Amino acid sequence: MILFAWKRYALLKQQKHAGWKIFIALMFMAALTSCQKSAPDNAEQRSPEPLQKITVAYTYQPQSTLVHVAVAKGYFTEEGLDVQPLMHTYGKAALQSVVENKADFATVAETPVMFNVLKGEKIFVIANIEASSMNNAIVARKDVGIISPGDLKGKRVGYTPGTTSDFFLDSLLTANGLTRQEIKPVALKPEEMQDAIIARKVDAISTWNYPLTQINRQLGADGTLFYDREIYTETFNIAARQDFVQKNPETVKSFLRALIKAEHFVTKNPDEAQSIMSATTKIDKNLIHDVWDAFNYHVVLDQTLLITLEDETRWAMKNKLTERTDMPDYLSFIHLDSLKAIEPEAIRMNR
């Protein structure tokens, strides 16, 4: 009898213990189910923020390679930016889009920056993205007697006002003992130059790539090129309105980070970068390859920019291309802080 009671007691205890196990298991399953049900809600809460839309005015020129690559490789998207492209044939027009508040960023050489500062526009250069001492030149027709730069005297020379074409022309003339008054300058848009020289409306033109190499190729044996790496170094830059930069500091940093990624890609993969440029600009890859070595693609802020801006300002004042008579404080138009925050070694400029 005692044995039977003991067995019954043990059985009840075992059942009670099993009941607790079942209860705990059920509670665990309920908690797990609750977590699974709430997972989509948590995932929704953690979903990435929508991309910030920005408009970038940039050119088909080789100087804008880093922007083309950053778009094609998705680097802007990785940095939270949705780039709306606004394409231009040259940087002066791209910068005008920024000045008119049609774009947030522009790729542009330093000469249009200088003229806009002299006009009182509140812009910042936030980075240099390219530099070259071999991108600008004068291409001339030999069959009109132009063999050396001195032969430009009395000839019709095409140029694009307010651009590096304008400044380089005067620099080359001065270096060869000539003045603007001793030639017949003809103002042309970049896209008009090739037809003008082929149709003999001008005898020479001052321009940049790609048109420079395209025109020289078309002229063949009748063409000649005048470079001078000692008199001018072009910088191609990212410019933006000062108020935009001040109100959107994180956007500016994200933009620069994407360009730095593009710089690293271009350095390691030049052939693929050339393919990207060919695909995005519809320009023959052989032409892109032929001019590639003329350019240095680095995201920096270099002292060269400051020196060139001041040199070009003196030129503009001397030639009465501006009403200003005092040198602007160009450092106040160069925004160092954003690039310094993400890549301090890229700052090569003295305050």
Give the label of every model feature segment:
Residues 36-38:
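Bacterial signal peptide processing site
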Residues 111-112, 185-186, 191-280:
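Pocket-lining segment of extracytoplasmic ligand-binding domains
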